Amino acid sequence: GEEGVGKLSLAMAIHNESEQRDGPFISVDCQMLSPENILHELLGSDVGPSPSKFELAHNGTLYLDKVEYLSGEVQSVLLKVLKTGLVTRSDSHRLIPVRFRLITCTSSSLREYVQQGAFSRQLYYEISMNEIEIPPLRKRREDLKQMIDDIIDKYQERTRKKMTITPDANSVLLEYRWP
């Protein structure tokens, strides 16, 4: 889905309702890191030691946001870990077994990246078992009332104060031309 449609919230909801809910939820923004840094983050290091994101997500969920930005090398590493269930830290030869749910996310069509040769076809088929497209808010206006109520509930819980929204403010939100 487009930026800001709630992909992270959906991924966390999937995690929280799954058998992995008691395990960790590890999130990686693939666009924010250079290919070298993302490889280091995913694989970890024995120097330090710095566990891999795969290890940190063991028995939980690894969420890769903006997966279309992964380099070919990182795609190969990810595919290998998914197929073998083993990770080797970047400066080691030791195989570490890992088990995690992978949720990947993109703001554009991964299928188009595959057709252009910019994304591994093999990895695409490995990660696209259950595709969910989240439409932007402008296409699901009927969700607004529930979202407003959920946000108010969340802030009431956080602040332990009673909060309400005025009818005028509610109308402004419901009538706003959302992107």
Where are these regions (language model features)?
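Nucleotide-binding/hydrolysis machinery
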Residues: 10, 16-23, 72, 91-101, ...
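Conserved helical "switch/dimer-interface" subregion of ABC/ABC-like ATPase nucleotide-binding domains
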Residues: 17, 77, 81, 89-90
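Structural recognition of the conserved hydrophobic beta-strand(s) that form the central parallel beta-sheet
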Residues: 27, 63-64, 100-107
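Conserved post-Walker A coupling segment in P-loop NTPases
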Residues: 1-45, 49, 55-71, 136-141
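Catalytic acidic motif of RecA-like/P-loop NTPases
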Residues: 68-69, 79, 83
